[in-house]
Amino acid sequence: MSLIKRIPSKNDTDSNDRLIPFINGEYRCANNDSMINLIEKLIIKKNSFSFDTETSSLSPFEADLVGISISTEKETGWYIPINHSSGNNISESNLTKIKQLFENEEIKKFAHNANYDISVLVNNDFKINNLNFDTLIAANLLNKRSLSLKNLCLEILRLQMTSIEELIGKGKDQISFKDVDIEKAVNYACADADATFRLKEIFEDELSKIGLQDVMNKIEIPLIPVIVEMQKSGVSINSQILNKISLELKNEISDLELRAKNIIGNEEVNLRSSQQLSDILINQMNI
């Protein structure tokens, strides 16, 4: 889900470094057989693509998947409408082709905040194989000032992206992304996938230079599907052992409270009261 842009402050730029609107490259809507076949050929040829999802909610397992944007190279993007309330959405047969591309183990995939996007896709019967890079995680490893895709574009690419509010509004007048016209969604959604592709190339090089590429490849990326599954299915617990631990901790806390009250010399004191503790420690015990 795309995040709202940050308004540039004086510290973000200066008079000699002018921000420009995000370049609308070759951004297209892919909602027919010929377009989907073209995407399929391009992805197989490039053997990699960046992707982003457009949804109806920030909660991935409650969100409707409205569309997917894909980029196979800089300044390109394809928006695949899936569940807009009006307009021509992709057919089920073509959606199956897109799912097969995500499932293909030979094709590398890149995303920004893959945890969210993969959670949404998995909840819509996608299977994601060979996730290769996450620009949000890379930004964190590189100690970037912001982790937001739009802020990173502002900071690194000097490109200002469209705010989600420009499409869906805000407050009581806010609409769902499902109700955004497909034509208006294309440039917005494709810019996210395009930006992810551009940042991936930059961050991958930076991680390699400081020796953190293995951290991304061997630790961070393999953890994402594990975390997604945990968020979706939960984690099994042994309730008997947890109840036993809970009882042990409760008894230990009671013993500590009794010892503290004996030291204070007042069995009626409420140790959970910050006011009483403050009076005892500062005024009575001069600590």
Q: Which stretches of residues belong to each language-model region?
A:
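Conserved "right-hand" nucleotidyltransferase catalytic core of DNA-directed polymerases
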Residues: 1-85, 144, 152, 164, ...
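Nucleic-acid-processing active sites and adjacent nucleic-acid-binding tracks
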Residues: 33, 73-109
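A structural signal for short coil/turn segments at secondary-structure junctions
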Residues: 43-46, 102-105, 125
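Acidic beta-strand-to-loop metal/phosphate-binding motif
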Residues: 50, 106-114
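Metal-dependent phosphoesterase core characteristic of DEDDh/y 3'-5' exonuclease domains
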Residues: 71, 115-172, 202, 226
